[in-house]
């Protein structure tokens, strides 16, 4: 047993230059843990509350001093004295202390920072890597990376409607080789864009952010890059999209406006037709948030039409929330959940969502946020839970590469017992 003797939070910066919460946990044994909380740009309306100060004189109102103070003045006194290995008990105590259904009193960013730092301190105490401490002896599966190499929507200042266009190197024999394949395609894409006279600046998640004629054109240039790198689209490398359609859903009309393509007033059925057409023309294996988070009828139609052969990931749809996920499972909506620790606010609840998804035959994709830091906790979570997939950005920006590098270390440490399933991690669809 190692008792927590101090908890301390401070305001630091994320990859977009916005403040976020860093938490440190100290124990009587000398074990120590530190964690930094990520932040999203396109957020689901049902997410746990990220507490911002709203003081326009500091960081344009995005300061997090209130969340920091909540850790130092409210949460710390509550959990000092806990055994650092009592993760569930500590998380439960913070949830009860907050007392709201969405962590709106203390802030999910305050609670999550403590939850993650506690896990790091506990792993330090028992002398295990974080993934082994959280996942036990069976934690050995390296995730298939979903690499966002073209950014659009809320993640870039361009005219592309869809938020992310990803490559998935499912044909690699190991995680290390999947990273090499992804990096080679990324560099090939830069050359393709340059040769077309297009911008090669990168967006929030490290992908390129060119102005393109359509969302279809984004897929076309990625196919060209895959082939230029010497790989075969639909064999070695598949495509994925995070549409983030809530960002271009018009609540007043109940329609979808693809402004970048000059197509407005699209119905849910027309959006589903569009996705089905794209999936016939391109080797798309995963679509995230294809319809608005509250358009459950649209999601149901999409699942009925292509859910047997395409992974349909719920991000804003499920917000890492077991109640929302249970509703989706009951109604047969989507077949996968995106796991973002700050959408729900504790590691305990995060693990519960992954477990529920797997029991129902849904896949789980551990994910970063667009506002990231050097913290690589999600890499360990992906291996600890054998989630099978991770979405943590492109092959540039240290805030993204930090997660890939941590996974490379874990694979090296696991040695011969490391597993990389590639295409088999999409176990609930037919390819």
Swiss-Prot record:
Gene3D superfamilies: Enolase-like C-terminal domain, Enolase-like, N-terminal domain. Binds a second Mg(2+) ion via substrate during catalysis. It is an enzyme of class 4 (lyase). Mg(2+) binds at residues 242, 288, 315. Its EC number is 4.2.1.11. It catalyses: (2R)-2-phosphoglycerate = phosphoenolpyruvate + H2O. Keywords: Cytoplasm, Glycolysis, Lyase, Magnesium, Metal-binding, Secreted. The active site is at 205 (proton donor), 340 (proton acceptor). The keyword Metal-binding applies. Its main location: cytoplasm. It is found in: Cytoplasm; Secreted; Cell surface. Pathway: Carbohydrate degradation; glycolysis; pyruvate from D-glyceraldehyde 3-phosphate: step 4/5. SUPFAM superfamilies: Enolase C-terminal domain-like, Enolase N-terminal domain-like. One of its GO terms (cellular component) is phosphopyruvate hydratase complex. InterPro entries: Enolase (IPR000941), Enolase-like_C_sf (IPR036849), Enolase-like_N (IPR029017), Enolase_C (IPR020810), Enolase_CS (IPR020809), Enolase_N (IPR020811). (2R)-2-phosphoglycerate binds at residues 163, 340, 369-370, 391. GO terms for molecular function: magnesium ion binding; phosphopyruvate hydratase activity. It comes from the Bacteria. Its cofactor is Mg(2+). GO terms for biological process: glycolytic process. NCBIfam families: eno. Belongs to the enolase family. Catalyzes the reversible conversion of 2-phosphoglycerate (2-PG) into phosphoenolpyruvate (PEP). It is essential for the degradation of carbohydrates via glycolysis. This is Enolase. It comes from Bacillus mycoides (strain KBAB4) (Bacillus weihenstephanensis). The lineage of its organism: Bacteria, Bacillati, Bacillota, Bacilli, Bacillales.
């Amino acid at each position: 047993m190692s008792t927590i003797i101090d908890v301390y939070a401070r305001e630091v910066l994320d990859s977009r230059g916005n403040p976020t919460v860093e938490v440190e946990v100290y124990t009587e044994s000398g074990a120590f843990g530190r964690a930094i909380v990520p932040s999203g740009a396109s957020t689901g309306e049902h997410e746990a509350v990220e507490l911002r100060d709203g003081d326009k004189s500091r960081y344009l109102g995005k300061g997090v001093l209130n969340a920091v103070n909540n850790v130092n003045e409210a949460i710390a006194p509550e959990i000092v004295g806990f055994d650092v290995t009592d993760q569930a008990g500590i998380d439960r105590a913070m949830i009860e202390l907050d007392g709201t259904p969405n962590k709106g009193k203390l802030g999910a960013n305050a609670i999550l920072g403590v939850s993650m730092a506690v896990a790091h301190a506990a792993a330090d105490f028992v002398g295990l890597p974080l993934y082994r401490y959280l996942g036990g002896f069976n934690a050995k599966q390296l995730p298939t990376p979903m690499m966002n190499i073209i950014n659009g929507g809320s993640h870039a200042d361009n005219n592309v409607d869809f938020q992310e266009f990803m490559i998935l190197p499912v044909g690699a024999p190991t995680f290390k080789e999947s990273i090499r394949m992804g990096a080679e395609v990324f560099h090939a894409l830069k050359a393709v864009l340059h040769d077309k006279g297009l911008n090669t600046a990168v967006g929030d998640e490290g992908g390129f952010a060119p102005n393109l004629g359509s969302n279809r054109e984004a897929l076309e240039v990625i196919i060209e890059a895959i082939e230029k790198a010497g790989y075969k689209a639909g064999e070695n490398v598949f495509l994925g999209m995070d549409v983030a359609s809530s960002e271009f859903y018009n609540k007043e009309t109940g329609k979808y406006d693809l402004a970048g393509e000059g197509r407005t007033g699209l119905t849910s059925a027309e959006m589903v037709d569009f996705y089905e057409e794209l999936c016939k023309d391109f080797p798309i294996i995963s679509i995230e948030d294809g319809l608005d988070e509250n358009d459950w009828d649209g999601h149901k139609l999409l699942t009925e039409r292509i859910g047997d052969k395409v992974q349909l990931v719920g991000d804003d749809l499920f917000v890492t929330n077991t109640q929302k996920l249970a509703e989706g499972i009951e109604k047969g909506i989507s077949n996968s959940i995106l796991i973002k620790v700050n959408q729900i606010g504790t590691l305990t609840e995060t693990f519960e969502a992954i477990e529920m998804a797997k029991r129902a035959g849904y896949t789980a994709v551990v994910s970063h946020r667009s506002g990231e830091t050097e913290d690589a906790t999600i890499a360990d979570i992906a291996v600890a839970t054998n989630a099978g997939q991770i979405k943590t950005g492109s092959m540039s920006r240290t805030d993204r590469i930090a997660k890939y590098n941590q996974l490379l270390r874990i694979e090296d440490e696991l040695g011969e017992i490391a597993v990389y399933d590639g295409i088999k991690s999409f176990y609930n669809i037919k390819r």
